[in-house]
Amino acid sequence: MRLSSASARIVIAALACLMAAMCKRAPATPAGAPSTPTVRVFVVTSLAGALEPCGCVKDMLGGIDHAAAFIRSRRESASSSLVLAAGPTLFMDPALKAEQRSQTLWKAEAIAASLADAKLVAWTPGVNDWAAGPDELARLRQATGAPLLAANLSGQTGGAESVKIVEAQGHKLGIVGIAVPLESDKAPAGVEVADAKAALEAAKQKLDAGGARIRIALLAMPRGAAMRMIESVSGYQLVIVGKAVDRGEVNDAPTPPTLVGETLVVQTPNHLQGVAVVDLFVRGDDMRFQDGSGLARAEKRETLRRRLEDLDRLISEAERPGSSVRPEDLEARRKDREAVKRDIEQNGVPEPPAAGSFFRYELEPVRESLGADAAVGERMKGYYKRVNDHNRTAFADRKPAPVPAGKSAYLGADKCVSCHGEEHKFWQSTNHSRAYGPLETQEKQFNLDCVGCHVTGYDKPGGSTVTHVSGLTNIQCEVCHGPASRHAEAPNDKSLILRAPPKSLCASECHHPPHVGKDWNVEQAWPRILGPGHGG
């Protein structure tokens, strides 16, 4: 059927109006239950200088190469994605140890470059990030390839900005950073800290003016203060909370996600133990995201998943030859594992809301099983080699402190064997006798972060140093029994040696979190170091 000229003009006019309307706003995602998120947000908080985990158990949590591999693999199944970080990122502590400044800066460089590889979009700093000074922070910020956001800071901020607006699938997302980098109520030198709430409210107006309808806040501040602020400032669909400051190697437990009004609040465990994934599904024009995860059940699922991981590890340990676990206890753990699996199935992810936009949340533990990003892995190897080559020379003259009068020096197992042959033979069958080898194969034997747990008498009078380890490599007799020079001279004087070290020594000296899993048990590990002539 042909259209009259008048009808044709009406149709053309209608099409023109429709096209104009489409140009004025982002295309809406069709109604229904989409399987592909409009935007996938990868979240890392309080990475705090953790390049990879350090310990003596398999498949530990952490590793920037594993996190990068995970992000790369999951990015492919989303329409668009962002990587965001908040809290201390580059350094483990608020201050650098003078002797470790070079290797700590090189580690920060490796972290910054790896974040760039992961396509970091924005990050907000914690106190630790000023550890090397504002100039180094500015240099490392450039290495990440992403802006540093801190709307409430001025002065020596390392080049921080207030907001960033990005576009994803036709939607503008506005990101603001708020940092409260205070340690003992003091900010880093030259940094002025303005009111966080006022800055967050002002940033929202700035984001609105820029056309952002999805608003994300990166907060680096104490969680309690962050939660109180979120309760009083509306308009942000996603808030990512990182710590204000972090110290040392201790790993935090996961913090469950929560809703404050219509705002999803997310915080991942420190040291890159996990990466949170927040999927935003946009349907229609409503940018209020409903809970598509069932957060109450999500918390229970996460608890169950951690329990399942613990049981898998315990069962694997118990199934090894020579295990001291009784068969009935092993069977009980297997039954527990099946029960936990059933509970996980019963607490599965619910169906999405029937209409409107919604989010889904998950926390992915970062483990070896995720694989390793090749480029990041090579960078890590380069970092370790650089440190090894540097420290071998820089600390070549570092010798152990002299032994005070009336005290014992370390002799080494080669001297102990002359009287304790049976014990020495058994020791050679244990992992303790091979502790130094992995450092050599991985070029970490001169790394100040590593060597202390792999040698005997480290940094003790008459013991070893990072470069002076002759005769004292590996975990030898004197780690547990104490230095033995006076014992060798007077073997009948039982007061000169610790004959039966307490089990607590294992945990206090070496086997403590995060170097072992939280389920590590000295009672189960103890039998592995007992044998002929050695308590067995």
Language-model-detected regions and their locations in the chain:
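Bacterial N-terminal signal peptides that target proteins for export
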Residues: 1-11
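Intrinsically disordered, low-complexity regions enriched in serine, threonine, proline
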Residues: 6, 21-22
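Bacterial N-terminal signal peptides
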Residues: 11-21
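Generic structural microfeature
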Residues: 18, 62, 118-119, 143, ...
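Active-site-proximal helix/loop capping residues that flank conserved catalytic or ligand/cofactor
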Residues: 21, 65, 113, 121-122, ...
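Acidic, metal/ion-coordinating pockets
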Residues: 23-383
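Short sequence/structural segments immediately N-terminal
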Residues: 30-38, 47, 148, 297-314, ...
